[in-house]
């Protein structure tokens, strides 16, 4: 049985036409439909022409949002030796080695991002069942397995995000807050599009971009004209 929509959602859906909107118009409409009583995130959902069950069609990488994420990212670091001090000085919220691994193993996950140095990954790998489903497992592709902790912490705190295509080939990403100006949201969305194009999997055949929708956390889905976004040139 289909879930009955609230009157609020019904009213918001009526504002959205069944068309692919020009990027700026879509973002303005997303802001207009962000009527919840909290600071809603700006979400983008992108369906790509890939089948991630094949290794050469997987997409997992990072993007730096030029206008930031609009939220404070809690960064935890698993390291040892002098790297512990480096991470602390760089502003990591949690730093540790065996003690932090033990806490995580008990289900204490009070961070949004986990970074680790390569030498501790054999121990971190044991946490895969806990971290993997939450998208928190450090990886070289995601920039979260590194010896340059200071740079990694700085970038992720400033708006760098790791993303991946799920098993159906869809990328789900938060690219800011609905309170951002349209211009800021557009800059961030353009950065996401360019990153996905730049990191096109070698095995991707045929039509790469299938559909792109944006929405507020509690708002209706709004289709964006993909070609218009890809052709868009932002003035610096």
Swiss-Prot record:
Annotated PROSITE patterns? RIBOSOMAL_L1
Q: Name one GO cellular component term.
A: large ribosomal subunit
Q: Which CDD domains match?
A: Ribosomal_L1
Q: Does the keyword Hydrolase apply?
A: no
Does the entry annotate any disulfide bonds, and if so which pairs? none
Top-level taxon in the UniProt lineage: Bacteria
PANTHER family in UniProt: 54S RIBOSOMAL PROTEIN L1, MITOCHONDRIAL, LARGE RIBOSOMAL SUBUNIT PROTEIN UL1M
Q: Give the similarity note.
A: Belongs to the universal ribosomal protein uL1 family.
Q: What is this protein called?
A: Large ribosomal subunit protein uL1
> What organism is recorded for this protein?
Synechococcus sp. (strain JA-3-3Ab)
Organismal lineage: Bacteria, Bacillati, Cyanobacteriota, Cyanophyceae, Synechococcales
